[in-house]
């Protein structure tokens, strides 16, 4: 039997506030265990939560960027369950009145566009974490409560995705948006952006969803895709054998590429939500929403369209007329797009700048332990100066790449490197003509073959002249003189 895949995603994004959602403790990652705690996040008797206003603003940002409606009256609820890393015995979250509802994101997979619904976005606090002893024969686990009370947004999609590729496209777009908004650092390995996937199968043509399995806390796009693919195969095999899929929570094992049961439906929590009596409702006014809307950055989709638009100024900045591929690569990160725009502002040849940013700049960063563009020692101003030297003919494109590598290593300006290393391009016709004559004189056989119709040898002659000039000869002058002499 053929089956239709049904996928819904729950994404937890850890917010980049300096302090926690209900107390003033730091949210810095990697601190000594239990060093960023207080009576509130330790759940001590009598400690009362105080809401961090920035969390609400970040939630509004996320809602506006994902086409949600913003709930005007927000209530926090207690989600009751026991776990060693949850000191209060409950988690403060939102239940029936989430801050954002009824949104959507548009994705594209293999040229096909599709709208994925977003059911809700709600604010909540994170739990602590268990640290398991990595010692043979020791089964102890320790509790680190530094993460307890860290602010989260849970973004819940509709079950609208019908393939692993659609799920990944949605996740990557959401990941890009929260990073553009500056509300999450997007670090999957550190758990700043983590995902639970609900996967089920139904017969093709049916409109009744099958029994779903929930795949928990997967921390990379690669593993999310692997987990969903495995789960599809597992459920299909059960159904083909006449069995029934059990509703359960499953964990993905990246070492084996498989999922294993964590708990079944009968073990599922009854969270017994009720309004938190220690927190008053949060009222969000239209003025507040519009103030947040006015501070939103240009989002990836709009920036991509602007980068591809032809000429002139458009809403959000300048249009550059770039190919779709270039725009897609440059918009991948807000910082990379800004680096490109800052360089074009100083050297207004967008395609040339795009080629260099996607080529030499990205290559150098990748070779340097995948450094971020923010850490690039070649600033937009330095890159623009290098490109100006190339445009003026002071150096050739080949020499420019050599100069760039030196700039990256030393942070020096291109002009200084060119001067120190004597790399100024030779454009003197007389000097280049002497080199051309010498090359032709030394290679009479190749000259005869070229004149006999083997025109592919032209590149050989160019290479010989460039070698003789140590790469300094102006290629345009070399080509012109060679053509003139070989065809005379």
Swiss-Prot record:
EC number: 6.3.5.-
Keyword annotations: ATP-binding, Ligase, Nucleotide-binding, Protein biosynthesis
Keyword Protein biosynthesis: yes
BP terms from Gene Ontology: glutaminyl-tRNAGln biosynthesis via transamidation; translation
Catalytic reactions of this protein: L-glutamyl-tRNA(Gln) + L-glutamine + ATP + H2O = L-glutaminyl-tRNA(Gln) + L-glutamate + ADP + phosphate + H(+); L-aspartyl-tRNA(Asn) + L-glutamine + ATP + H2O = L-asparaginyl-tRNA(Asn) + L-glutamate + ADP + phosphate + 2 H(+)
Pfam families linked to this entry: GatB_N, GatB_Yqey
Role summary: Allows the formation of correctly charged Asn-tRNA(Asn) or Gln-tRNA(Gln) through the transamidation of misacylated Asp-tRNA(Asn) or Glu-tRNA(Gln) in organisms which lack either or both of asparaginyl-tRNA or glutaminyl-tRNA synthetases. The reaction takes place in the presence of glutamine and ATP through an activated phospho-Asp-tRNA(Asn) or phospho-Glu-tRNA(Gln).
Family designation: Belongs to the GatB/GatE family. GatB subfamily.
Subunit structure: Heterotrimer of A, B and C subunits.
Protein name stated in the entry: Aspartyl/glutamyl-tRNA(Asn/Gln) amidotransferase subunit B
Lineage: Bacteria, Pseudomonadati, Thermodesulfobacteriota, Desulfuromonadia, Geobacterales
């Amino acid at each position: 039997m053929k089956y239709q895949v049904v996928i819904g995603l729950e994404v937890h994004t850890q917010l980049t506030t300096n302090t926690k959602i209900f107390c003033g403790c730091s949210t810095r990652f990697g601190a000594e265990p239990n060093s960023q705690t207080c009576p509130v996040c330790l759940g001590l008797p009598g400690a009362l939560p105080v809401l961090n206003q920035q969390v609400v603003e970040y939630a509004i940002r996320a809602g506006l960027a994902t086409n949600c409606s913003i709930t005007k009256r927000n209530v926090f609820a207690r989600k009751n369950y026991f776990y060693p890393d949850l000191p209060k015995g409950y988690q403060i979250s939102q239940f029936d009145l989430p801050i954002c509802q009824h949104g959507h994101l548009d994705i594209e997979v293999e040229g096909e566009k599709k709208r994925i619904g977003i059911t809700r976005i709600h604010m909540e606090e994170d739990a602590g974490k268990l640290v398991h002893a990595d010692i043979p024969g020791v089964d102890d686990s320790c509790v680190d409560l530094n993460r307890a009370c860290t602010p989260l947004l849970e973004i819940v999609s509709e079950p609208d995705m019908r393939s692993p590729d659609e799920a990944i496209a949605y996740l990557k777009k959401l990941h890009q948006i929260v990073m553009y908004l500056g509300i999450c650092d997007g670090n999957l390995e550190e758990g700043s952006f983590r995902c639970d996937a609900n996967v089920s199968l139904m017969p093709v043509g049916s409109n009744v969803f099958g029994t779903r399995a929930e795949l928990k806390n997967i921390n990379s796009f690669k593993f999310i895709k692997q987990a969903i693919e495995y789960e599809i195969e597992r459920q299909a095999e059960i159904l083909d054998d006449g069995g029934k899929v059990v509703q359960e929570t499953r964990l993905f094992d990246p070492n084996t590429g498989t999922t294993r049961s964590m708990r079944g439906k009968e073990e599922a929590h009854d969270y017994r939500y009720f309004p938190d009596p220690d927190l008053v409702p949060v009222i969000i006014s239209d003025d507040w929403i519009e103030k947040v809307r006015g501070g939103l950055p240009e989002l990836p989709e709009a920036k991509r369209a602007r980068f591809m638009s032809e000429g002139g100024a458009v809403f959000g900045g300048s249009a550059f007329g770039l190919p779709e591929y270039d725009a897609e690569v440059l918009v991948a990160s807000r910082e990379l797009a800004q680096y490109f725009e800052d360089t074009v502002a100083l050297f207004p040849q967008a395609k040339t700048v795009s080629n260099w940013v996607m080529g030499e700049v990205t290559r150098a960063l990748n070779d340097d332990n995948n450094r971020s563009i923010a850490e690039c020692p070649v600033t937009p101003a330095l890159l623009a100066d290098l490109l100006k030297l190339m445009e003026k003919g002071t150096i050739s494109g080949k020499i420019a790449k050599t100069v760039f590598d030196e700039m990256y290593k030393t942070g020096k300006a291109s002009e200084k490197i060119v001067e120190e290393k004597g790399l100024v391009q030779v454009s003197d016709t007389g000097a280049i003509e002497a080199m051309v004559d010498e090359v032709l004189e030394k290679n009479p056989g190749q000259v005869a073959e070229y004149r006999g119709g083997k025109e592919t040898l032209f590149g050989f002659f160019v290479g010989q002249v460039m070698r003789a000039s140590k790469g300094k000869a102006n290629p345009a002058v070399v080509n012109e003189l060679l053509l003139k002499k070989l065809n005379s």
